[in-house]
Design a protein with these regions (language model features):
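N-proximal helix/coil linker or "cap" segments that precede and/or mark the start of modular domains
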Residues: 4-6, 11-37
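Short, acidic, Ser/Thr-enriched surface-loop or helix-capping motifs
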Residues: 24, 38, 118, 148-149
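Short loop/turn microsegments at loop-to-beta-strand junctions
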Residues: 31, 56, 142-144
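A short beta-strand-turn-helix
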Residues: 34-56
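Short active-site neighborhood of thiol/selenol oxidoreductases, capturing the structured segment around
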Residues: 48-71
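Structural microenvironment flanking redox-active thiols in thiol-disulfide oxidoreductases
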Residues: 71-112, 123-125
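Short, internal strand/loop/helix patches
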Residues: 106-142
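Thiol-/selenol-based redox modules, centered on thioredoxin-like
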Residues: 140-180
């Protein structure tokens, strides 16, 4: 009986797609996007190409505003915003939250230090950051950070649902970019 259960479970596992970590690869060109976002509670249009004209961009996707991990990650990025700025980089957080939620989150948790923007279905697909539960898209994004060089190429990718290393690793990558 146990053999049959194990065989059935193994066969079923082959049918259910695994939670792929198929984020965009280092060296890929970051897809451009324009979406709505918020900085210090004020709505704004966000365009990747325009941000890259100023320097590298740390684009980090987080699953849901005001959840514990996303709040702690926003606090960590807010505390490090000055370090990112010294390295010439702009930080942009993205989730599929609506604009009113992003406006509140940009003030309450991002502490008015950096913008957050709406990750549309097209952006989620383009960056391959759909959070899947049992192989089904949840509508949320995976916790994935990209460092995008001024030329639009991705120089660093970190995808891990634990927020703790995202700031450290992206800041290291930005500093390395600055050194050349």
């Amino acid at each position: 009986m146990i053999k049959h259960v194990l065989a059935a479970a193994a066969a079923l596992a082959l049918l259910v797609p695994a939670a792929a970590n198929a984020e965009l690869a280092q060296g890929a060109v970051a897809p451009d996007f324009t979406t709505m976002g918020a900085l210090a509670g004020k709505p704004m249009k966000v365009n990747l190409k325009a941000l890259l004209a100023k320097g590298p961009v740390v684009l980090y996707f987080y699953p849901k505003a005001f959840t514990s991990g996303c709040t702690m990650e926003a606090h960590a990025f807010a505390e490090a915003t000055g370090d990112f700025a010294k390295a010439g980089a702009t930080v942009l957080g993205m989730s599929n939250d609506d604009l009113p939620t992003l406006q509140k989150f940009s003030t309450a948790e991002c502490r008015d230090k950096f913008a957050v923007a709406a990750a549309t279905k097209d952006v989620i697909k383009a960056y391959d950051v759909s959070l899947k539960v049992a192989g089904i898209a949840s509508g949320l994004t995976k916790r994935t950070s990209y460092v995008i060089a001024k030329n639009g190429k991705i120089v660093m990718v970190h995808s891990n649902m634990d927020y703790k290393d995202h700031v450290k690793l992206t800041l290291e990558a930005v500093k390395k970019l600055k050194k050349g």
